[in-house]
Amino acid sequence: MKLLAVRRLLRIQRVVIRYRLDDLILELPMLPWWLRLLGATLPWRWLPRRKLELTRGARLRLALQDLGPIFIKFGQILSTRRDLLPDDIANELAWLQDKVPPFPPELAVKRIEEQLGAKIEQVFARFEREPLASASVAQVHAARLKSGEEVVVKVIRPNLEPVIRSDIAWLFILARLAERVSSEARRLHPVEVVSDYEKTIVDELDLLREAANASQLRRNFEGSPLLYVPQVYWDWCRPKVLVMERIYGIPVTDLETLRDQRTDFKALAERGVEIFFTQVFRDSFFHADMHPGNIFVSTRAPWSPQYIAVDCGIVGSLTDEDQDYLARNLIAFFKRDYRKVAQLHIDSGWVPAETKVNDFEAAIRTVCEPIFEKPLKDISFGQVLLRLFQTARRFNMEIQPQLVLLQKTLLNIEGLGRQLYPELDLWATAQPFLERWMRERVSPKQLLRNFQQQVEQVPHLSQMARDTLERLSQPHAHNAPPPEWKGSRHDWLGRLVGAVLLVGAAEVGLGQQLEAWPAWVMLAGGVFLILRR
């Protein structure tokens, strides 16, 4: 392992020198003066080197490609963090392609047989040794099950884990070094960025997780005309092998074939937007890797086109609170209610509670007003989120990984939609959905569901009260800091009182020792205190 790490370090050093990334690093404004001086004394900087007529973004992209698949995927993820990177570098990194030569079919067959515990001929009536596709983490083969179903078999590359561990270790070393030498780097949280990447790559190595994600997404859109997700054949799925239904669709980027079958491009673009908002707000479970290589279009009904999604290795979800605040933020933004946008960021805990709402409102207005000089159909929804994140970052916003996944997915969907139909007005498509969702949040059915969830907590009230009294009875309890309640915007004291009223209402109502009206008053008061925001 140590020998592998040393060899990898030498390889990284050669690539840095070849693409003159040392120049790029030394130009960083966050670099302290003493490190610039140290960098200027590096031996190779005094030797003649050929001049590269490439932009800094292109040099970084080519270097990551040379360093191999793990660095390529890291660059792809980094390209989505436009709140951290300059636009020219982020745009260049977006061109990184996760394509590598396939590994020998003999190794694929061996790994499949090891995982399934059976010979390939015992499981499949036909297995095509030539892969359909190959990427840095896995490759895909076509096959047919003994029961007759046409399937694809995805298999993880052999001997990948040691390389990943080594590369991730070096990324962490570089991130920690950056945090140690620069306060500006610490503000960008490089260790957190690498940690997010580590989680992503580890998740992609577990094909049972991908199978579970695909099954969930398929169930969410069962019978839907919007999206089809291939069936998972669980009997033949293992941590390193995934067997799914083979789909036959048109790649979403093959515009010529889509035109030939007379696809309704306007409907196709609008359905992409509807799929995104349905996943985020109805299901709180969204496919977070919706780049064109993972999206196909069904050939069945071109006048009512249906998407087909594959590769569910990366998914995202939002809490109920984040869903609510995101929807209200977007609606307030498009109404130019910047005060409300600022207040929502503070209330949600996305920026520190001590943030001055007037200053934050002014910063948002400065960034966003120029955007509204364009017609609504020309406004990028993804860029709106990006600009909000960039502005909030100046106010020490801690951007959650799920929100980054959301912004990346929205940019992909929006870019794809406008490629299919340039006149796509994303706001006109999204606004009715968001407003309907907000209305449903306060519908009697939803309020009853919320009430039932709160009532489930009633049996725990006596223990909560006992714990509180014990804490207050302890010496120095009044000098101790208050307990840290989770959720910055919930009035837990009010909810506790509301729950007590509910218990009282139940006691009065069931005891039947008094008239019924006190129970109704207590019930109404309890419901109000529990459900109020």
UniProtKB/Swiss-Prot annotation:
This is Probable protein kinase UbiB. Keywords: ATP-binding, Cell inner membrane, Cell membrane, Kinase, Membrane, Nucleotide-binding, Transferase, Transmembrane, Transmembrane helix, Ubiquinone biosynthesis. Pathway: Cofactor biosynthesis; ubiquinone biosynthesis [regulation]. One of its GO terms (cellular component) is plasma membrane. It comes from Pseudomonas aeruginosa (strain ATCC 15692 / DSM 22644 / CIP 104116 / JCM 14847 / LMG 12228 / 1C / PRS 101 / PAO1). The lineage of its organism: Bacteria, Pseudomonadati, Pseudomonadota, Gammaproteobacteria, Pseudomonadales. The chain crosses the membrane at residues 24-44, 510-530. HAMAP family: UbiB (MF_00414). Is probably a protein kinase regulator of UbiI activity which is involved in aerobic coenzyme Q (ubiquinone) biosynthesis.
